[in-house]
Amino acid sequence: EIAQCLVGSEMCIRDRYYLHYFTTETTKYHEALPDILKSYDPVTGLWPESPGYALGTVSMLLDIALMLKSNGIDIIADNPVMQKAALAVFPWIDEQCNLIVFGDSRGGSANFTMFENLLTYYTLTKDEDNIKKIAAALNMGINSGNYNRSKSNWTGLCTYVRSIPQVENIETERMSYSAHHRMITMKNYNGNNKMMALLYGGKKGYHLSANGLAMQLYGFGYALAPDAAGYESYWSADVTYHQSATGSNTIMPGYTEGEIKINAMEPMVDSLSYTNSKELNPYINFADVTAGEKRRMVATIRTSDETGYYLDLFRSNLDNNDYLYHNLGTSLSLYTKSNKELKLTSVEDLGVTYSKGYDYFANPRKISYKDDFMVHWKNDKSPISMCMWMLGAENREIYQVDAPYTTLNKALTPGEVSTPPSFTPTLVVRQNSNAWTKPFIGIFEPVKNNKKSVESVTALHTENNFIGLIVASTNGKKDYLLHSIDNQPHHLKGNLSFSGNFSLIREKEGQIEMLYLGNGSLLKKGNYTIEATNNAYVSIYKNNGTWYYSSDSEVNVVLAGKKIHLSAGYNQEITF
């Protein structure tokens, strides 16, 4: 605010004395721009706090920058981190241009004034690539109803470009990672049904939260599995729930905050980048993260332009574990794998609790159940809902509870569900045994009008260091999902072998059309093989009848019995 006053004074009286104290010299009363910008991460361009704070500061700086640019002073060009900070918002917005929610952030639409200022700046500097990127964001906000340009103030009337260019959809980053925030975002916008997931650790300070090793899942433009942010204020009693791991999708007790370790990630984000620069194929994202005694792998898996699902594989090396999962909706129902509804019994409470946030779980219902089951979160106010399939394990109890509403912002939920005074239908899967050797394994599919594309989820192997399952879809596709944590070869019936972190083999009507190997050295099924000397990231996939491959190193493959040696490369056609 002091900086804005200094620049405003300079503009009024045309005296460069004030401008010097903004652009160059810090005093004991204020910081000049170079010192302000030292708070931004030089790699990501992010401010160290939660999204509302992280992106609000750069917006004010851009207001100043545009005033100065119109007077011949370009502080953006002179301070490259400022441009990086302005563009850092993109991985942290969803397809409706709403900010992601974590820490004490409440979400809501991105700052479109910032985008307008950027569009003016890039128009003045004739930066065509960034003009397209910013114009696409503004059009997205207008089309989603989040932004109305006609309500701009007089400053906008004087400084905004006359009209926003109509541009084709721009390519969206597939993966981003901020080590400071312990936040990974995954996006797959390669179809009409845009997919997005968040995987993140907890952190105290910087307006961040001890939220555990948490996950959020998106569908049709909404965070359907959100992080709770409906607290009244920092000082209200409900902050105990909304700003703790109990309001997140995680496992309790155990890790709530601390360093995380990335075991594997694809598309990869290197240590000198904020987002990925390459990707193995258009269909899969995954990240495998360790935090304390927890380890979680989340994947987004596309099965067509219109369909896809998420995989959540969550381990906890404790003897008692509550898997917490909150989803927007008006109710939830549980079913056996043969689609018979499970009847839960009302109980007084959950018995053992692991934080004060449990006090906010109301109307608990319970069943002891060790087999596979399916859950449908229903929404009486919108056609958008969520389906979940979870593989069974011994020593499990399933609780259904009414958690507090998720947000105060009615625009962030389909049909305004899970906003005051309603609730958030929540699942608690309690495992009264170690969940490292018998992890929680879930498949999630956002659906519209109850039209599921996932037909069945079947276990191949669900214990110890190796997990295998099959996801069959209604379009005739069958995905073999394999995951291990020991880097050893594993062999299953059907001439199926695997060594690595994560892999997927896709068949359609019995014919293999994709092999994906994430941080591994062997993947084989029948007459199809990927083999590497050292762990590699490799994908072989068929598109419109043509085989393509991507690999970060040299590999040997076998396609339909034919041996081929492939050099490192991305999205290259395979010639036989």
Q: Would you name each region that the model predicts?
A:
Residues L427-K438, E445-F576:
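Non-catalytic terminal regions with compositionally biased, polar/charged low complexity
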Residues K378-T474:
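Beta-strand-rich recognition/accessory modules
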Residues N327-N395:
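Polysaccharide-binding surfaces and accessory modules of carbohydrate-active proteins
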Residues E10, R14-K28, A65-Q83, Y122-A136, ...:
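Structural helix-adjacent loops and short alpha-helical linkers that scaffold large soluble proteins
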Residues E1-G8, I13:
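Single conserved hydrophobic/aromatic residue that forms the stacking wall/gate
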Residues I76-K151:
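C-terminal, helix-dominated tail/subdomain
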Residues I134-N139, N143-V352, N434-K438, G442, ...:
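Catalytic and substrate-binding regions of extracellular carbohydrate-active enzymes
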Residues Y17-G45, V81-N98:
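Long, well-ordered core segments of solenoidal/helical folds
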